[in-house]
């Protein structure tokens, strides 16, 4: 019997597979209601901000040959309503499922406020800190591109909450290792990586970008080699747990990410092609591990053999 159980700070996972933040909303989107979320290792909810946020102009999503461009934005009803309605309903439906909430904001104070409220709710097991949000005080530059800002933000949130926190790293940086080290110095309990790569596509007939917001985040197959490279680099400088993401659509992908250094994974864009992608990956994983003669998935973490 292959062991796929993974134990991370705050998250006791029966298997290492969860949906990427935003994929299943707050458990209220159609895809999330087509199967039992208890089949997954955990549920990660959509990024939550202090106040209700509307999304970006339409179109918000462009399906490409090898990935997805999205500029959906952090559409959510605000933290108070997320707790009183969305999370309360999700937790009632799934009393034993590990739930990770995703925290966003325009300022450090925003992040701390949302983190404190989510932590105090008692409805979630861990927090993912989405540092890809634009920092209004810094002219709109993403929080996650500056090591000093990441360290300080992580420290402030860590001091304010008792829950484990996972800092979600943006790949839109020169050196992701430096940012990962900053998150660890700030007291992060784990790292999620990678968020989407900033991209743009243009319709040559209309000469307009495909997205209403012009630019958006690229995810899916196209970013997989970048995600694997970055996870491998970060694994060499930290022992922190890593939740890996970026183009995972098969059980083989899960194994590849774990060999690179991830402890668990999140599946996002694959759900555009297969609404049950995460469920199917969970079902296929034990057989794929058996083929490789692996008895415990945890034994594979960071075991890539470099040339």
Curated annotation (Swiss-Prot):
Predominant localisation class: cytoplasm
Reactions catalysed, as given in the entry: (S)-dihydroorotate + fumarate = orotate + succinate
Pfam family, one: DHO_dh
Record keywords: Cytoplasm, Flavoprotein, FMN, Oxidoreductase, Pyrimidine biosynthesis
Subcellular location: Cytoplasm
Cofactor: FMN
EC assignment: 1.3.98.1
Family statement: Belongs to the dihydroorotate dehydrogenase family. Type 1 subfamily.
NCBIfam families: PRK07259.1 (NF005574), pyrD_sub1_fam (TIGR01037)
Assembly with partners or alone: Homodimer.
Protein name, UniProt field: Dihydroorotate dehydrogenase A (fumarate)
Top-level taxonomy: Bacteria, Bacillati, Bacillota, Bacilli, Lactobacillales
């Amino acid at each position: 019997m292959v062991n796929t159980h993974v134990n991370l700070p705050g998250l006791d996972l029966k298997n290492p597979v969860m949906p990427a933040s935003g994929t299943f909303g707050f458990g209220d989107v159609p895809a999330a209601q087509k199967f039992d979320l208890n089949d997954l290792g955990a549920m990660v909810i959509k990024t939550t901000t202090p106040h209700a946020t509307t999304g970006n102009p339409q179109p918000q999503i462009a399906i490409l040959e090898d990935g997805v461009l999205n500029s959906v934005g952090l559409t959510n009803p605000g933290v108070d309503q997320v707790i009183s309605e969305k999370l309360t309903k999700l937790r009632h439906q799934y009393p034993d499922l590990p739930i990770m909430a995703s925290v966003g904001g325009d300022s450090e104070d925003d992040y701390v406020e949302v983190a404190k409220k989510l932590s105090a709710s008692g409805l979630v097991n861990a927090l993912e800190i989405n540092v890809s949000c634009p920092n209004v005080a810094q002219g709109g530059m993403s929080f996650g591109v500056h090591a000093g800002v990441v360290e300080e933000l992580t420290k402030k949130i860590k001091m304010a909450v008792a829950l484990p926190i996972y800092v979600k790293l943006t790949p839109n940086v020169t050196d992701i290792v430096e940012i990962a080290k900053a998150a660890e110095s700030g007291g992060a309990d784990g790292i999620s990586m990678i968020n989407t790569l900033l991209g743009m596509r243009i319709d040559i007939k209309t000469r307009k970008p495909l997205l209403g917001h012009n630019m958006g985040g690229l995810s899916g197959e196209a970013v997989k080699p970048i995600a694997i490279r970055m996870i491998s680099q970060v694994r060499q400088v930290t022992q922190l747990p890593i939740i890996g993401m970026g183009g995972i659509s098969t059980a083989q992908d899960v194994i590849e990410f774990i060999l690179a250094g991830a402890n668990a994974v999140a599946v996002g864009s694959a759900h555009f092609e297969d609404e049950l992608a995460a469920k199917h990956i969970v079902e296929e994983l034990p057989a794929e591990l058996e083929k490789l003669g692996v008895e415990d998935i945890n034994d594979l973490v960071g075991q890539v053999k470099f040339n």
